[in-house]
Amino acid sequence: MIIGIGHDICDQRRVGAIFDRFGIRFSARILTREEQAELQARKNKYAYLAGRFAVKEAVYKALAAADQTEMRWHYAATLSGKNGAPQLILSGACLAGAKTLLPPGHGLKLHISLSDEPPYSSAFVVLSAEQETE
């Protein structure tokens, strides 16, 4: 059962201009430590930053019904999985908000699609509730 859907698109040029101006101060503000480590290994830093920014915005939109006011950039992380596919990890108020949307006896499942087509990065996030097995 779907409990939240969010989408965002971000201009890599805009994020790149901010990164060029503020550097690590900008990336440290929006990325977790793990995401910052991945950023350092990337050739196209603007696309990476824009994609992660879009994911975080999409997460906040998917959680709109949770009415959380304490969400922070670091509470939604997107890391590369073993096969290179993005893996979404929620913590803090993002995770707490998602759990408030779950019906009794259900667990949280996170789905993410991240696309880069210069100069844009787009992210689509779906939060779903799955029946827990006993």
Map each language-model feature to its residues:
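Core catalytic alpha/beta fold that binds nucleotide/phospho-ligands
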Residues: M1-E134
